From Swiss-Prot:
CDD domains: AdoMet_MTases. Gene3D superfamilies: Vaccinia Virus protein VP39 (3.40.50.150). HAMAP family: 16SrRNA_methyltr_G (MF_00074). It comes from Thermotoga petrophila (strain ATCC BAA-488 / DSM 13995 / JCM 10881 / RKU-1). Belongs to the methyltransferase superfamily. RNA methyltransferase RsmG family. The keyword Transferase applies. Specifically methylates the N7 position of a guanine in 16S rRNA. One of its GO terms (cellular component) is cytosol. This is Ribosomal RNA small subunit methyltransferase G. GO terms for molecular function: rRNA (guanine-N7-)-methyltransferase activity. It comes from the Bacteria. It is found in: Cytoplasm.
Length: 228
């Protein structure tokens, strides 16, 4: 079985030994949790899905403040915090089980640049408007919903980093109204493939103007009645 270090080396990803040690501990914790927090039961699958998939499309250093919406098991926010020490990361999730897991992992990994908040994204984005340099999410919702619940917390000029699968083209078409309403534009798409055969894309959107105060709408509405 490959080690975390060997898998990252296969992809030419750069790292320092302390980062590998933290990822090792994180994967160990991840593989020990119940099935409702992760579907991965082996190291190779867990590293590909939760580490390689996050780092591979990133070409620049991330620094400043980052919000991970619907963080779940800590991906992508926790991984970004480990590999980009100049980032100050907030992991946001409304589920008690996820929040408890994340707090435990942060303590065990001794991560000083990460905090956890238990709240719905709609409430958090309204309360913490224009605060973050980056907002990221993976496997939380379709793009039009993400744009509404994430963009208000983003600074003008900041970037949305959304990890998507091959269906992102359809989601982009569907999200045009939301992007216009929330004042964001697509900056670039980075398509990439894992050696497992899976195809992925990182969508990078830039906020060019402050979002209207009416967004996000109240809890649940963006999911039930998305902007189309």
């Amino acid at each position: 079985m490959d080690s975390v270090k060997n898998i990252l080396l296969e992809y030419g990803l750069r790292f320092q030994e302390p980062q590998i040690e933290k990822v090792d501990k994180y994967i160990e914790e991840l593989l020990g949790v119940p099935y409702n927090l992760t579907a991965h039961r082996d190291l190779d699958s867990a590293v590909h899905k939760n580490v390689v998939e996050i780092l591979l499309p990133l070409k620049e250093e991330l620094k400043g403040t980052l919000l991970d919406v619907g963080s779940g098991n800590g991906v992508p926010g926790l991984i970004l915090a480990i590999f980009f020490s100049k980032l100050k990361v907030v992991l946001l999730d409304s589920r008690e089980k996820s929040v408890n897991f994340l707090r435990g992992v942060i303590e065990k990994l001794d991560l000083e640049n990460v905090s956890v908040v238990k709240e719905r994204a709609e409430n958090f984005s309204k309360e913490r408007r224009e605060e973050f340099d980056y907002v990221t999410a993976r496997a939380v919702a379709r793009l039009n919903v993400l744009v509404e619940i994430c963009t208000p917390a983003l600074k003008t000029g900041g970037k949305l980093l959304f990890y998507k699968g091959p269906s992102y083209i359809e989601e982009l078409k569907e999200a045009q109204r939301a992007m216009k309403e929330l004042k964001v534009e697509l900056e670039k798409v980075r398509e990439y493939s894992l050696k497992t055969g899976e195809r992925r894309a990182l969508l990078i959107l830039r906020k060019y103007e402050s979002s209207p105060e009416k967004y996000p709408r109240r809890v649940g509405v963006p999911f039930k009645r998305p902007l189309l």
